[in-house]
From Swiss-Prot:
Keywords: Metal-binding, Ribonucleoprotein, Ribosomal protein, RNA-binding, rRNA-binding, Zinc
Zinc is among the record's keywords: yes
Single GO cellular component term: cytoplasm
Cofactor requirements of the protein: Zn(2+)
Keyword Ribonucleoprotein among UniProt keywords: yes
Subunit structure: Part of the 30S ribosomal subunit. Contacts proteins S3 and S10.
Purpose of the protein: Binds 16S rRNA, required for the assembly of 30S particles and may also be responsible for determining the conformation of the 16S rRNA at the A site.
Cofactor note: Binds 1 zinc ion per subunit.
Species this protein is from: Trichlorobacter lovleyi (strain ATCC BAA-1151 / DSM 17278 / SZ) (Geobacter lovleyi)
Protein name: Small ribosomal subunit protein uS14
GO BP term, example: translation
Pfam families linked: Ribosomal_S14 (PF00253)
Lineage top rank: taxon: Bacteria
Bilayer-crossing regions: none
Taxonomic classification: Bacteria, Pseudomonadati, Thermodesulfobacteriota, Desulfuromonadia, Geobacterales
Length: 61
């Protein structure tokens, strides 16, 4: 879980636009963020395996 202080700090608008960093809205994780799903890899895996993300299926080959 992300630190509450860092989550609050990231919600403020930065002085420069390039300083903005994507965070997972579920857990607040700043790294391993998937733009397509708007969440981190850990939450993506959890929700995909539970079947809560439409169109995502487990692949096998």
């Amino acid at each position: 879980m992300a630190k509450v202080s860092m989550i609050n700090k990231s919600q403020r608008t930065p002085k420069f636009k390039v300083r903005q960093h994507n965070r997972c809205p579920v857990c607040g994780r700043p790294k391993a963020f998937y733009r397509k799903f708007q969440m981190c890899r850990i939450c993506l895996r959890k929700y995909a395996s539970a079947g809560q993300i439409p169109g995502v299926i487990k692949s096998s080959w």
